[in-house]
């Protein structure tokens, strides 16, 4: 049996109620972490807490809107107060803010500001709070930022979103250099289109079929695919990895016949 070095460590997962975040919380618990689960969906948090406890680990549930000033700091402080420390932070924040993909000429200033705020600015706020706690504690740790495959290539309909996620990649690299001397690793994962409940509801069957046909491995991510990758990077298996963006898209970045967005 491989020792991942995660037993007894404490992880904080934001955006933890559905999809990738929920899978990450569950898999970190399976790997031995106690987990603080954070999401603004107050009704959904208890279910993820039960997921963690079902794996025999301690859990803290916190309903919080990280867009509010000071909330990221409060969430980190609550995690340490309840679970004793912080070792791993997974920043699964950000989305299209309910706005959906759109041609760039239809992305007005309000659209761009909202998408950048919910992706780059939220991630930066979380990183700042987590890094401060890890450096102060002096025992090192790992910060994992959830980026996107759309940050690595032109993404029709996702100009603001892709740019915000690309900025997260740069933030990840810079923090890796700044925090490395304190023993803190910072990495990012870039999922391709992942079959979360939100994505399943948003995409037509015809579009999904066309997208799968364009992907070299002929499949799309499930949330568990990303969760296993996060666990590997957060564990001692990934102890030499920092400042890296790790793609998990089944080869979609190599596709030349990717279907156009359905709005087009």
Q: Where would I find each of the regions flagged by the language model?
A:
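Conserved mid-core segment of classical short-chain dehydrogenase/reductases
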Residues: 96-113, 157-160, 200-201, 260-261
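Active-site helix of classical SDR
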Residues: 127, 164, 172
């Amino acid at each position: 049996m491989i020792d991942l070095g995660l037993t007894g460590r404490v992880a904080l997962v934001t955006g933890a109620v559905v999809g990738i975040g929920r899978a990450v919380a569950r898999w970190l618990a399976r790997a031995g972490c106690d987990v603080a689960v954070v999401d603004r969906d107050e009704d959904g948090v208890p279910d993820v807490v039960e997921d963690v406890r079902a794996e025999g680990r301690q859990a803290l549930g916190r309903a919080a809107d990280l867009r509010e000033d000071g909330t990221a700091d409060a969430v980190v402080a609550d995690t340490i107060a309840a679970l004793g420390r912080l070792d791993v932070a997974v920043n699964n924040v950000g989305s299209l803010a309910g706005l959906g993909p759109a041609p760039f000429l239809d992305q007005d200033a309000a659209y761009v500001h909202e998408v950048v705020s919910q992706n780059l600015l939220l991630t930066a706020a979380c990183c700042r709070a987590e890094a401060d706690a890890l450096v102060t504690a002096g025992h090192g740790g790992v910060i994992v930022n959830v980026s996107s495959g759309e940050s690595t290539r032109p993404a029709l309909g996702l100009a603001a979103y892709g740019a915000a996620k690309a900025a997260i990649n740069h933030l990840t690299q810079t923090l890796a250099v700044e925090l490395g001397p304190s023993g803190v690793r910072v990495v990012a994962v870039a999922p391709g289109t992942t079959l979360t409940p939100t994505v399943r509801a948003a995409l037509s069957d015809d579009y999904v079929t066309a997208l799968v046909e364009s992907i070299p491995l002929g499949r799309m991510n499930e949330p568990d695919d990303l969760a296993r990758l996060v666990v590997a990077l957060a564990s001692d298996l990934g102890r030499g990895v920092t400042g890296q963006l790790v793609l998990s898209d089944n080869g979609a970045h190599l596709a030349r016949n990717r279907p156009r967005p359905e709005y087009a």
